Each structure stands twice: as structure tokens, then as C-alpha cells.
Amino acid sequence: MSRPFSSGVYVSRGVALLLAALTAVLLLVLVALASLYGSCAHVQPSEQGNSRVKNTSLWPPGGQEWALPTPAQEPTVGTSQDLGPPSGPWDHLRLPPWLVPLHYDLELWPWLQPDKLSPPNLTFTGRVNITVRCTVASSRLLLHSFLLNYKQVEVWGPLAQDTRNATVGRVQVEKVWFAPDMQFVVLDLGQSLEPGSRYELSFHFSGQVLQVGLEGLFLNLYHDEDELRALVATQMEPTFARHVFPCFDEPALKATFNITVIHHPGYAALSNMPQLGQSERIDVNGSRWTVTTFHTTPRMPTYLVALVVCDLDHISRTERGKEIRVWARKDDIANGYLDFAANITGPIFSFLEDLFNISYRLPKTDIVALPIFASGAMENWGLLIFDESSLLLEPEDELTEKRAMILSIIAHEVGHQWFGNLVTMSWWNNIWLNEGFASYFELELTNYFYPKVPMNMIFFFTVLHGILGEDHALESRAVSTAVENFTETSEINRLFDLYTYKKGACMAWMLASFLSPHLFINALKSYLETFSYSNAEQDDLWRHIQMVIVPFRHFLAEH
């Protein structure tokens, strides 16, 4: 092959120099733009060391400013993909293991008033002090937070030994910024926290009460006694606590909570624990508000934190010295539509206490029938929330099937007081440990109270046959999956499916069948006692089943 002829464009030396200069300028512009290219918005405290955070703007690392949205708008914060974040722990969906939460002092103030039931932008304000233990030295802290605005952020500590509030110093907060894709708020500190020491993280924040979605802190509008009324309630499971307050929003990061709710005097405030006391607060407009405080909770995950602010009516029952209150519209209470739910809840608690020989650990139970509740029912510890359609029964309705259905729904949520609340799965990939056993004991309780209802046949044809059919599908899955497959909220939400509930119930039914009910319950007793106020994984359950099988096998061998 012969050498090809040269071809091209020829320019003069002057033109070449001009092109070179333009290229250099272009490169400088690109470098400048790259330096402005940030990951996420952040908020700058003042240069004087004051930890008050401006809540009027969001600042990316390069200094460019975006205007904060009005409360009714979606935030205009650039996503991490849009802004090209630097590499860091905020790239991951799980919290880094730098801090362990120990206790939350949480105050929430929903600005709901009876004469302003449907404001265009109903908001809430709040404060939280989180006591944490540092496990890894770091000058950067990550917590979960989503769609919250911050007014003040402070870090105090290290805390003095053997006390919770006494502090021996203060840690400078140099910068506060957000990683909205991963739903983190990030604190850049002036110094690293000391491993083994305890600190207090303090936040003043605000957010929206949702009027469309029914997650986080949301509003219900309804009619009662021929009047328009309103209430606010919470739904934190699985990952919506971060919509209400900054927190460590993972199920294994349990802590105790002191909860305070500020509300209009015309409303009642409910939370997980009994009321501790009430006082009065006057706002800047001179309006009077009631401050209701509650007793300290046991150690529990953030997804079980609950509150309701309402003017519902209630009826009370007492079971083994503990009060059970059922709340609903005044009309429904007056008509006796909640009597059956109130009468059956106590015996359900007693049945499970006797079965496991483990008492219900909270001093009270409130059951609230919401006019609208998209989740259907939620097992918040001490404050169970239902859609009212799941609980209402006309007193003259003697239909056993209707009563059995209401009983089964209540039984499922009461079962969670042991499976999920007392013992919680370590991560959402094992949510079947909560839902599967609650679904199984829902069947057992219905059989116990209504033996003439063919629940075994119903279970066989609707649950077992149904899941066997679905298990042949291409999209079938195991009840427990790899942790890394379920980290985003959308992925976690998909776990609340028929495989978790129905296949999980079938797993429990199978275990009870081949172990025998006696060994099965003994294994569950051991499991619940060992992991009370803590977390467990699927393998922990298998170990406790093995623990009851081995002695029984030896007994059979000797006899």
C-alpha cells in the first residue's frame, strides 16, 4: 500500500495564536464552572460561631443561591445527580455507623385550629434534642431529613458522665447542607467527635402537614355532628419519620423518646405513652396553646413514633389493670359503632400475654379510627391507628363473618405489639418476621374466638393456595432477601406485599405444623424474651427453633 497524500486546512500563524488563546480561555471557564459544580444544597451558619441557620435560602458548595420554595411547592433543591456531588457517605442509602442514638426529646407543634380547618399551607414546627454516642471519630454527621427547613442547629458535648444533659463543651457547626436524593441532612463540624463520648444534637425545624398524601404528619378533613372537622395524625412506617423530624430513621437504631405535643386547647393529643402533664404556652400573636407531655417510651425505632391531635370522642375499657381507649367520630361513638372493637381488644391482648407468658409492656393502649387512612391499619406502640371502615360495626349487626373480620384486623395489629414492637427486624429485608407472624396469629385468634368460622379452610384456600399460585410466577421472591436489594424507600415499600404477609404466614403455619404447636410457641417465647427491646434477623429465629428441637430430640432418643 502506498503512503496516502496529506490533506487538511492551513491557517496563518496569527490565526493559530488566536485559536490557542481562545482555547486557553475556554479551559479556564470550564475549570471555574467545575469549581461551582456542587453536590447538594447547604446552609451556612454565621461567621461568629453562632449555630443559627438561615432558613431563607439553600446554598450549594460554590455559593450559588436558590430561593426556598413556598410551603405548598416542591423544593427546587438540585438533586445529587444534577449537581454532581463529591464522593462521600451521603452517596449511600444507609447511615454510616458513626453515631448511635440513645434518646430523643421531641417537641412538635402542628398549627391546627378549629376555626382554620383548611388553610392553604398547614405547617408544623418542632424541636428535637438527640442524645447520641460517638463510635467513630468524625467531623461530619449524617441524619435522615426530608423536606424539613432548619432554623437552628447545635451540637453540645461531650456530655458529662452519668448524666444526660450536663455538658462540658460545645462543638462548632460550620456548615449544614442537604443530600436530598438520599434524604440526609449533613453537619460539617469544626472538630471531630470523640469515640466513646456522648453528645446532644439540637435542631429547630419546620415542615408541612400533608393534605394530600397520608404519610409523615398528615391532615384528615371530615364531617361529624353535621360540622366540618379536622385532625392531624402520623404514619411513619417505613421511612417517613424523617419527614417529621431529623432522626436516625433505621429500624435497628432504637432509642427512648420523650414526646411533647403543642396543640389547640380544643383538641386532645395522643401519643405512644400516657399523658404526663399539661401546661400552657402563648404564641407571638397572644393565642393560647396547650402543651401536653408524655411519659418516656421504651426503646423503639423511629417508625413507631406516633401522635394524633383531634377532637374525636372515645370509650374506655380496662383489661388486667390497663386502660384501652377507642377513639372515633362523636356520632359513631354515640351510636355504639365502636363497642365491639372496644370489647374485643382487651381479650386479644390477654390471649397473647398468656400464650407467650410475656406481658404487654406499655401501661395503656389507644386505638384511633381515622376517617381516612390509606395504610389501613398501623401498629404504633401504644397508639394503634385504623381506617374507621375496619372497625365500625352496627350493634344490631349479628353477622359472625363481619365480627370475625374486625377481630382479625385488630388481632393483626395487636400481634405486632410483640412481633415488630417488642422485637424488631434489623432491616426491612426481614419484614416478614413482623408481618408473617402477625398474620399467622390473626388466624389463631380468630379461630379461638370464633371456632365455628372455618378459618383453617379459609386460610388453606385463600392464603396457602393463593401464594402457591403466585410462587410459580416469574416475579416471585423469597420472604427474606439480601439487605442491599432493599435500601431505597420505594424498594422498601414494595416489600409490603403478599409474599411478606401471606407467604410469611404460611411459613409460620408450616413451622407450627411440623414442630408441633407446643415446641413452636416455646421457640417463639425464647426468641421474644432474648430480643426484647432489640432487633433480630431471620437466622436468630432459626437458632431459637433449633434450641427447642435439640432437647426434644434427645428426649425422644432416651425414651
Swiss-Prot record:
Enzyme nomenclature, EC number: 3.4.11.-
Task: Kindly indicate whether the keyword Zinc belongs to this entry.
Answer: yes
Primary location class: membrane
- Where does it sit, as one GO cellular component term? membrane
Residues noted as binding substrate in the record, renumbered to the chain: 237, 376-380
Q: How does it sit in the membrane?
A: Single-pass type II membrane protein
Give this protein's Gene Ontology molecular function annotations.
metallopeptidase activity; zinc ion binding
Q: Where is the protein situated, by its record's location annotation?
A: Membrane
Q: What is this protein called?
A: Aminopeptidase Q
* Residues binding Zn(2+), per UniProt: 412, 416, 435
**According to the UniProt record, what class of enzyme is this?**
hydrolase
**Alphabetic keyword roster:** Glycoprotein, Hydrolase, Membrane, Metal-binding, Metalloprotease, Protease, Signal-anchor, Transmembrane, Transmembrane helix, Zinc
Q: Which organism is this protein's natural source?
A: Mus musculus (Mouse)
- Stretches assigned to the Cytoplasmic side: 1-13
Cofactor descriptive note: Binds 1 zinc ion per subunit.
Q: Which residues lie on this side of the membrane: Lumenal?
A: 35-559
Q: Where are the transmembrane segments?
A: 14-34
Q: Which domain of life is it from?
A: Eukaryota
Disulfide pairings? none
Q: Which Pfam families match?
A: Peptidase_M1 (PF01433), Peptidase_M1_N (PF17900)
State the activity regulation.
Answer: Inhibited by bestatin.
The record describes the protein's role as:
Metalloprotease which may be important for placentation by regulating biological activity of key peptides at the embryo-maternal interface. On synthetic substrates it shows a marked preference for Leu-4-methylcoumaryl-7-amide (Leu-MCA) over Met-MCA, Arg-LCA and Lys-LCA. Cleaves the N-terminal amino acid of several peptides such as angiotensin-3, kisspeptin-10 and endokinin C.
* Necessary cofactors: Zn(2+)
Catalytic residues in the record: 413
Family, as annotated: Belongs to the peptidase M1 family.
